Amino acid sequence: MPTISCDKEELYKALGREYTTQEFDELCFQFGIELDEDTTNDPERSPSERPSLKIDIPANRYDMLCLEGIAQALNVFNRRMATPQYKLLPSTTSLTISPETSEIRPYAAAAILRGVKLDPIRYQSFIALQDKLHANLCRNRTLVAIGTHDFSVMEGPFTYEALKPEEINFVPLNQTQEINGSNLLEFYKDSKHLSRYLHIIANSPRYPVILDAKRRVCSLPPIINSEFSKISVDTRDIFIDVTATDKTKLEIVVNMMTTMFSCYCEEPFTIEPVNIISEHNGCTRVTPNLNPTCFKADIDYLNEACGLSLPEDEICHLLTRMMLTAKPNPNDSKTLLVYVPPLRADILHQCDIMEDLGIAYGYDNLKHTYPAHSVTFGKPFEVNRLADIIRNEVAYAGWSEVMPFILCSHDENYAWLRKTDDSKAVQLANPKTLEFQVVRSSLLPGILKTVRENKNHALPIKIFEVSDVAFCDYSRERMTRNERHLCAIFAGLNSGFEQIHGLLDRVMLMLNTKRIMNPKDSDAVGYWIEAEDDSTFFPGRCAAVYYRKDFGTAGIRVGVFGVLHPLVLEKFELTSAASAVEIDLTLWV
């Protein structure tokens, strides 16, 4: 859940009254949000810093990512104001999208807010809304990027193009020197704020740019705007550009940016649209589209799901508290037509309308009832049931379970285990830290790191993990597959090979899998071990585990165990000898 920090005085002013902390906490609770913190009495707050309220917002309520949206939603909920009716002014400019943008960011939208009256607090809220949208819905600008400009210094019509880096020259925001696009990545590689976005366009032969009629670069999404169109507290006309790889999220973002701050326009709730000309992909239209979306909601469903028996007129009246306009369906007496305003992008189904009805009615007002039928419980997946049995049996044998991170570094997954990259590991596209680069394809790195962090404990250390590893599998819909593995390690004064071997035999006994002593002379179901050279283990002290699931079939390699190689122990900073086993449990499901 995003946490929004609002100026306490400004929020209460917008709500029309002062609240005690307890009163406001109760209001938030009734609405379905949560007051996380009131900094009024925070000893760490500096005297020059105004008190603020930190409010946890549901992740899908993009209309509440700023003070203006929170105040508007609560005012409508308290019936202090009606749902705003947004008005589109005549369009005066256009944005033409070139076909080349399909190579990198194919969609764009724009809008203009006229006569906006900003002050320092409103300006900060405007910038904060962009940041919150970028961090949440926009997925750190990978899906959508927002640019805001002082329209008074720009000249339309505008074009959205994809140019070669060397063809781009402009002065970036908060800079004084002009730079060439070919130097952009180098220029911002050490920027704490912008370097995290460079990967989005780093491998593209063309960069997206928005140009005005004079061919001046207004924006180079998703990285930086131009200095010449920089907005300030004194800006009165704001041009908003939005570019995206996802058209649905593009429309949501442009609607949020315009509806939230159109309240400060000279004529409140008015927005000047922009004609988007995109003939190459059939996306020519006018943005923003502020027409309400109509849903059909079954009256019986709304009542039964909430445990109510309300007439349709009362349901319609209650839904107005949630900014929804409902009326009886003239063609079906059992349903309502519910009109959802453009800022309520979280409404996707009649179940969302049902939830809003429950909030408007008040969850505290719902009758306390018990289910009419006996409560049932879900049946566990077989792989989970098997994993739980394994956990218990290994723990009974005197081993302690650990739960390391699912992610690890590329080196930990390969080089530190003395393995080469086989391209089977699922890699993160833009990892934030070196420790979390890939999804582990073995449980061993996590187990070894756990021993490293506990190497000062009394020896021996006997720990295990039963969990999933992941592999790339391009034959599947999600192009990955999971396997449930068991991994255990013994670290002590001696290698403890016999301890690991004994644990393997104990697990196989528990799985009712017999040991086959001469697999070449037998077609029986069971398991056997064969000597193997594995670079992770000491030469001559390693064996592979094979399992024959059905009579007469070939054995399948399901695991490996042995004494860990000294170079592996050195990489993980271990000074004790150690042995480990790892087997794939999925064949027993």
From Swiss-Prot:
Required co-factors: Mg(2+)
Gene3D superfamilies found in the cross-reference section: 3.30.56.10, Bira Bifunctional Protein, Domain 2, Phenylalanyl-trna Synthetase, Chain B, domain 3
Disulfide bond residue pairs: none
Subunit structure comment from the entry: Tetramer of two alpha and two beta subunits.
Keyword set, alphabetical order: Aminoacyl-tRNA synthetase, ATP-binding, Cytoplasm, Ligase, Magnesium, Metal-binding, Nucleotide-binding, Nucleus, Protein biosynthesis
Catalytic activity: tRNA(Phe) + L-phenylalanine + ATP = L-phenylalanyl-tRNA(Phe) + AMP + diphosphate + H(+)
Stated family: Belongs to the phenylalanyl-tRNA synthetase beta subunit family. Type 2 subfamily.
A GO MF label: phenylalanine-tRNA ligase activity
Domain B5: 290-368
Name of the featured protein: Phenylalanine--tRNA ligase beta subunit
Residues reported in the UniProt entry to bind Mg(2+): 346, 352, 355-356
Pfam families cross-referenced by the UniProt entry: B3_4, B5, PhetRS_B1, tRNA_synthFbeta
Subcellular location: Cytoplasm; Nucleus
CDD domains given in the database record: PheRS_beta_core
Enzyme Commission designation: 6.1.1.20
Originating species: Schizosaccharomyces pombe (strain 972 / ATCC 24843) (Fission yeast)
Gene Ontology cellular component annotations, sorted alphabetically: cytosol; nucleus; phenylalanine-tRNA ligase complex
Gene field: frs1
UniProt-listed GO biological process terms: cytoplasmic translation; phenylalanyl-tRNA aminoacylation
